[in-house]
């Protein structure tokens, strides 16, 4: 809403009509002071009788209609969905929602008026100067008066930063605003000798990262001078990184002893600086010149723009003030405020000259020359001289690298030699010390449109411009110049999503000449490699795999068909061999036909392990021709032609590279898993193959359902590869109980309770058909009880008693049947698994020795079993080293995951405890035994929560076969399924339901809209083209939830909030809670609540101690909020954890908390922090693993994110407000009965209603009840008649489990929908959500103030979400709005 048109009232004649926008005025003259008739409470000129003079103020005290009485008409209950059959309440008193009054103190009113007045005046001034409107106007900061040049008086000069004006047609989005580049960062970079325009370009390319921008400029500068000399020598390739790091550490100690405090290691093994005192340079350039020059500049130039200094001037090149930072502001504290750890000083000691040594990650110094930079604060030293000194020093470093000698001390000595350096001072010109040459406009036919929200790509001036492919963006020249510096150097990146997204918007094509040269080199190396003994030895092993026999068939089909489906059993070699068949075939051909292959994997560990395996088979290290890329990590180089990546990484690339330019083959592995991402990728690829006839797609499945995929791609050909495995004996639960002689003890947690047995019997009776009921009654009446009695196969085992189980399992011992009859089949029995492991390790059987693979549902079960085995002397290795135990889970580090592939010493049994990650994604060769718990975590839609959740479910028959196939790789194997044979044959599904049909679709909707190819399509039309579309009702519900959250517009367009939620792989409501927690600086508590919502509540309630557990929970309660009670409990746990593990255990036991749930929440908090860091909402570079390592007890998030992100972490009212924004529209109205009164000696007193008399109603579901586990269960009075909830549970009645009271201001300021103000019976009613939520404003002024403040807040949140790097603390407009919101929520 434009601030310049907020008031439509006219100061004129009276009798105007009241409206939510103000009164309709009369025809009074604007240039006179006659008062208008006002009308119904108009704004300018006021309302009322018309006797007051018109005022130019926005609000006046006389406009305040003080209406404190509530309207007499009772509020209308919103129960439109009440079913006809619902019984009326038994009590007679009518219940109603108390209509609360929206108050605001006079002090707060004045402050809000002053704030809005300032904001609107600035907006009006900005609008009149600019003459534009819309999003561009809203997103710009507010500036002071007379900031821009008067119309027609603008000075004529070229704009500072305009290269993007030459890229693309007019509809391309406006350039990155100047606030994206800090003037302090530009000034800092320029002191290395680079011109400010080069600095600005580099900073934009590197997303404001000062260290990365410096390295980018240095490489660009040095590559033009030294070219191929910068290449890594062949000797350095084979040197280990550990050896290089050790030598650097030794040199560090030597430099510290020689240079003392002048030497500083800014970043360990990355950045060194040495302060220098070069008096001869200071004396050579007289300081008087500087003073004279600066004086002339001050006399002739306009003063510096104050908004530019703050980092954001909306007028840009039209501003009449100077966009430069004065030299006096660049020293001291201001200079150190540049937020870059690579360059910041650790203390206040400064030197006029500094030598900086920089090492990239995995740098091979001293076998490889480091980047060398000469830095000076001497403003009289010419920029060109600084660069010539840096080049001279780098040349010396290259010479030392040939002999692998340390170079830093030698460089210091060279700088102190006046005779050597003075020679360089005669060179006063350098290409990078002057502005770059203007880039010519791109011809219109080669311009390429950009997708929505795409950041502009800044071109670079390089020498490759004449070698570009047609249609390639100019920005690629810069990247290719870097790539052509030498042979393929492996780049290991921890790349954030922000940087990945920015890079993805550049074309992936490379210059034809550069690509041909690189391919020629790769072909030559491959031909040489084929002659080596090592390669031949590995090739012979590869030829033993079943996939090798189909090599010619596969290549022949690919030469004729664009899409091929390959079905192969686990272990046939399809994942490792088929990509190599394609690559090797292309390497034996001409260089211009070399393949560029991407192979997707469903999990991170798969991408890493397979890439390392394939690289080993090719007798090279990973990162050369074979690399991998996962979220936040990539190991690849310019020579990589086979890239293994996760499905999500490829989908992210598609956001900026819609047709996968430069890619020749896409291989989608494990398509049979039918994940949401893989099904969506198939839809995208089906579109791309229609556009790119040269792109080939190979789908690989480990099951025999390949026909479905073949049909989806127009009946493309299918190849079936047989598996290679030894016979595997398959056993079930009854067999496991027999061999281990396991017996359930009384009171065992794995025993079914009597209540559960009764429940199962009741369930079985309900599930019977009418015919089965008749048959059962007839059997009982005729006493048909013979030996041949049978039990129907449709009845599950858990619904049978001992006698029925005897009938079903003939030949099984009674002791086993007795155990089965009382066992809880829904639980994973860790005791039985331990007993099986003892049987296997003891070796009292005929099976050969080998590794054991145990499949468990999730990380919690893995931890429990691991700890349980550690208390068993057979497994803990305290007496003898008989076993080694490895957990395997996707959240573990790469090093921990790789340990499972290491073969143990002779006589030691390797036990791997894994989730279904080991089912198809990876192959562990030495596994002989498999224990299948029969359970897995599966994403499901939780109707109670209205969101996605991970639930324990039984595996399918296909899953069970895959798990069985993991055994028998090297010898005859054994597989124990911990479910019965009957359950396997009659209860398990043949295939799991595709994920897309059982999960909420909000995330996929957002992902579809973020892709350029689907951004303008109707969601229904896109979903209908999926291989197996979800139900239309599921899509409809997801669209409603997205609109309620503000992520999607009614016409299905993505909002800025939706854009960022699409980048967070979490439920959209949790994502919104995380974002708002970051914006309002209460991050840590917001993440704690988000982790609980995403996982589960840590409060536990044992059957025999329910009352005691509820009382303990009430001790944490305050502000009528389950979420704030959770927050208190979690804080207490963190404090106890910092004391000791024992204290943590006692705290959980005493307060009925689950320690494992709290640990899972802590892990989730760290993951959420990483995600926010990844998209730029908290400081970049935060990684969950690093946070966990640095945490000294607790989760470590508060310390990692810093005080700035948690300024309001102790403000419970603000936390509730942020929660309101995330959970809305999950609001419950509290209806209270009409008052009862009691006579007393002092008069009549109103009685509090009983808790049972309160009624709770939702907008869509009618009446609900508060769950007994909630802290609000027995509450008799709520200060506010509105509660927020997260989850509904339907049993005999509909319950809301956790809820939190929310007051007036959070609802008005953060609730969904538009705020409406209406005059009803003399009172101004503020309403939300079509009148579902209503308040009475204390006055018209209060109503309008709140409404206008809500508009400003909405706009500010949009600006922040559009630009996550915007600092609301330093932004004058943002900080004032946030402060006012916090004050109103806290004090009113």
UniProtKB/Swiss-Prot annotation:
Keyword Transferase: no
Sorted UniProt keywords: ATP-binding, Coiled coil, Helicase, Hydrolase, Metal-binding, Nucleotide-binding, Phosphoprotein, Zinc, Zinc-finger
Zn finger intervals (C3H1-type): 299-326
Residue ranges constituting the UBA domain according to the UniProt record: 175-220
Gly residues bias: start-end ranges: 34-51
UniProt xrefs under SUPFAM superfamilies: CCCH zinc finger (SSF90229), P-loop containing nucleoside triphosphate hydrolases (SSF52540), UBA-like (SSF46934)
A Pfam entry, by short name: OB_NTP_bind
MF GO annotations: ATP binding; ATP hydrolysis activity; nucleic acid binding; RNA helicase activity; zinc ion binding
Protein name: Putative ATP-dependent RNA helicase DHX57
Organism per entry: Mus musculus
Name of the coding gene: Dhx57
């Amino acid at each position: 809403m434009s601030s310049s048109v907020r008031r439509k009232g006219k100061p004129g004649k009276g009798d105007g009509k009241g409206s939510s926008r103000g009164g309709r005025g009369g025809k009074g003259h604007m240039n006179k002071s006659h008062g208008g008739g006002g009308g119904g409470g108009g704004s300018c000129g006021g309302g009322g009788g018309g006797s007051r003079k018109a005022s130019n103020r926005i609000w006046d005290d006389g406009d305040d209609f003080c209406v404190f009485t509530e309207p007499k008409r009772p509020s209308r209950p919103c129960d439109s969905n009440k079913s006809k059959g619902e019984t009326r309440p038994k009590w007679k008193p009518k219940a109603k929602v108390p209509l609360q009054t929206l108050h605001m103190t006079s002090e707060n009113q004045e402050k809000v008026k002053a704030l809005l007045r300032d904001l609107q005046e600035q907006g009006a001034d900005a609008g009149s100067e600019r003459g534009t409107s819309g999003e561009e106007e809203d997103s710009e900061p507010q500036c002071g008066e007379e900031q821009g040049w008067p119309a027609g008086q603008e000075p004529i000069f070229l704009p500072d930063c305009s290269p993007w004006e030459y890229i693309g047609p007019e509809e391309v989005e406006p350039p990155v605003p100047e606030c994206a580049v800090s003037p302090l960062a530009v000034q800092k970079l320029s002191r290395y000798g680079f011109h400010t325009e080069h600095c600005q370009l580099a900073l934009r390319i590197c997303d404001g990262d000062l260290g990365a921008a410096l390295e980018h400029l240095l490489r660009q500068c040095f590559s033009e001078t030294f070219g191929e000399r910068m290449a890594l020598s062949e000797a350095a390739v084979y040197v280990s990184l550990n050896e290089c790091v050790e030598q650097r550490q030794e040199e560090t100690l030597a430099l510290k002893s020689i240079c003392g405090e002048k030497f500083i290691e800014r970043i360990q093994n990355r950045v060194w600086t040495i302060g220098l005192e070069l008096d001869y340079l200071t004396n050579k350039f007289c300081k008087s010149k500087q003073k004279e020059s600066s004086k002339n500049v001050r006399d002739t130039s306009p003063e510096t723009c104050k908004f530019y200094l703050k980092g954001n001037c909306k007028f840009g090149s039209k501003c009449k003030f100077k966009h430069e930072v004065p030299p006096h502001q660049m020293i001291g504290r201001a200079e150190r405020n540049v937020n870059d750890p690579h360059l910041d000083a650790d203390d206040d000691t400064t030197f006029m000259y500094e030598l900086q040594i920089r090492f990239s990650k995995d740098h091979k110094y001293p076998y490889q020359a480091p980047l060398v930079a000469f830095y000076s604060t001497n403003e009289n030293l010419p920029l060109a001289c600084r660069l010539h000194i840096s080049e001279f020093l780098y040349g010396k470093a290259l010479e030392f690298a040939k002999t692998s000698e340390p170079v830093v001390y030698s460089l210091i000595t060279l700088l102190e030699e006046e005779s050597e350096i003075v020679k360089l001072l005669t060179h006063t010109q350098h290409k990078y010390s002057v502005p770059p040459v203007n880039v010519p406009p791109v011809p219109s036919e080669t311009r390429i449109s950009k997708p929505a929200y795409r950041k502009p790509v800044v071109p670079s001036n390089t020498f490759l411009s004449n070698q570009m492919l047609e249609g390639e963006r100019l920005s690629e020249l810069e990247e290719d110049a870097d790539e052509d510096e030498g042979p393929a150097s492996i780049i290991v990146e921890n790349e954030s999503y922000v940087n990945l997204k920015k890079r993805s918007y550049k074309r992936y094509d490379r210059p034809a000449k550069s690509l041909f040269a690189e391919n020629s080199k790769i072909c030559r190396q491959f031909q040489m490699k084929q002659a080596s003994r090592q390669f031949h030895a590995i090739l012979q092993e590869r030829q033993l795999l079943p996939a090798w026999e189909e090599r010619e068939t596969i290549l022949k089909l690919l030469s004729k068909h664009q899409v091929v489906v390959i079905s192969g059993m686990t272990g046939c070699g399809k994942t490792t061999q088929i990509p190599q068949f394609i690559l090797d075939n292309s390497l034996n051909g001409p260089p211009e036909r070399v393949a560029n292959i991407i192979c997707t994997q469903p999990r991170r560990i798969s991408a890493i392990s397979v890439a390392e395996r394939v690289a080993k088979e090719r007798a090279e290290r990973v990162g050369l021709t074979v690399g991998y890329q996962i979220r936040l990590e990539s190991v690849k180089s310019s020579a990589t032609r086979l890239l293994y990546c996760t499905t999500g990484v490829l989908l992210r690339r598609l956001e900026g590279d819609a047709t996968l330019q430069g890619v020749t083959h896409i291989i989608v592995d494990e398509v049979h898993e039918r994940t949401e991402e893989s099904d969506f990728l198939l839809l995208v690829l089906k579109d791309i193959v229609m556009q790119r006839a040269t792109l080939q797609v190979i789908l690989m499945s480990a099951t025999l359902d390949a026909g479905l995929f073949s049909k989806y791609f127009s009946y493309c050909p299918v190849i079936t590869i047989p598996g290679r495995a030894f016979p595997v004996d398959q056993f079930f639960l009854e067999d496991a109980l027999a061999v281990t002689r396991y017996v359930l003890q009384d009171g065992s947690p794995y025993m079914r309770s009597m209540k559960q047995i009764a429940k199962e019997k009741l369930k079985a009776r309900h599930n019977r058909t009418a015919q089965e009921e008749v048959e059962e009654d007839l059997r009982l009446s005729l006493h048909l009880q013979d030996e041949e009695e049978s039990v129907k196969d449709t009845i599950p085992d858990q619904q049978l008693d001992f006698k029925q189980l005897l009938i079903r399992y003939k030949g099984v011992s009674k002791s086993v049947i007795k155990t089965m009859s009382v066992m809880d089949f829904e639980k994973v029995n860790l005791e039985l698994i331990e007993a099986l492991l003892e049987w296997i390790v003891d070796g009292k059987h005929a099976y050969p020795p080998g590794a054991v693979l145990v499949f468990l549902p999730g990380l919690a079960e893995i931890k429990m079993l691991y700890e349980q085995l550690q208390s068993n002397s057979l497994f803990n290795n305290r007496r003898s080293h008989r076993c080694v135990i490895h957990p395997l889970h996707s959240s573990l580090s790469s090093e921990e995951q790789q340990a499972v592939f290491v073969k143990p010493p002779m006589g030691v049994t390797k036990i791997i405890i894994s989730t279904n990650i080991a089912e198809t994604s990876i192959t562990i060769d030495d596994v002989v035994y498999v224990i299948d718990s029969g359970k897995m975590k599966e994403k499901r839609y939780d109707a109670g929560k209205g969101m996605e959740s991970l639930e324990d479910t039984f595996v399918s028959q296909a899953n069970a076969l895959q798990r069985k196939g993991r055994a028998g790789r090297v010898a005859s194997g054994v597989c124990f399924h911990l479910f019965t044979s009957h359950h396997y044959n009659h209860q398990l599904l043949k295939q799991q339901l595709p994920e897309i049909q059982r999960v909420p679709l909000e995330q996929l909707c957002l992902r579809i809209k973020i892709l350029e190819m689907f951004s303008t399509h109707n969601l229904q039309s896109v979903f209908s083209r999926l291989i197996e579309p979800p139900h239309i009702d599921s899509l409809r519900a997801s669209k409603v939830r997205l609109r309620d959250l503000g992520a999607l517009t009614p016409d299905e367009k993505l909002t800025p909030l939706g854009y960022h939620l699409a980048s967070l792989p979490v439920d959209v409501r949790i994502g919104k809670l995380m974002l708002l927690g970051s914006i309002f600086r209460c991050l840590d508590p917001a993440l704690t609540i988000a982790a609980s919502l995403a996982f589960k509540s840590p409060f536990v309630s044992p059957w025999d101690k329910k009352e005691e557990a509820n009382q303990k929970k009430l001790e944490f309660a305050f502000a009528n909020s389950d979420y704030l009670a959770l927050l208190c409990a979690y804080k207490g746990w963190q404090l106890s954890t910092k004391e000791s593990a024992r204290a943590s255990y006692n705290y959980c036991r005493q307060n009925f908390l689950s320690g494992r749930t709290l640990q899972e929440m802590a892990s989730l908090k760290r993951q959420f922090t990483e995600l926010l860091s990844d998209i730029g909402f908290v400081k970049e570079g935060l990684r969950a693993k690093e946070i966990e390592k640095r945490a000294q007890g607790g989760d470590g998030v508060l310390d990692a994110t810093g005080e700035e992100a948690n300024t309001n972490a102790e403000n419970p009212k603000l936390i509730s407000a942020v929660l309101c924004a995330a959970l809305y529209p999950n609001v419950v109205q509290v209806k209270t009965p009409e008052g009862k009164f009691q006579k007393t000696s002092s008069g009549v007193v109103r009685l509090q209603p009983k808790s049972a008399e309160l009624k709770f109603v939702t907008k869509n579901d009618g009446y609900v009840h508060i769950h007994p586990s909630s802290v609000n269960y027995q509450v008799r009075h709520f200060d506010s008649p509105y509660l927020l909830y997260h989850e509904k549970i339907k049993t005999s009645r509909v319950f809301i489990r956790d809820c939190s009271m929310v007051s007036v201001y959070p609802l008005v300021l953060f609730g969904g929908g538009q705020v409406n103000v209406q005059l009803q019976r003399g009172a101004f009613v503020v309403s939300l959500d079509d009148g579902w939520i209503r308040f009475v404003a204390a006055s018209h002024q209060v109503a309008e103030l709140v409404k206008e403040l809500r508009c400003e807040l909405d706009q500010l949140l949009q600006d922040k979400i559009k630009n996550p790097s915007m600092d609301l603390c330093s932004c004058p407009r943002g900080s004032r709005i946030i402060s006012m919101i916090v004050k109103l929520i806290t004090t009113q």
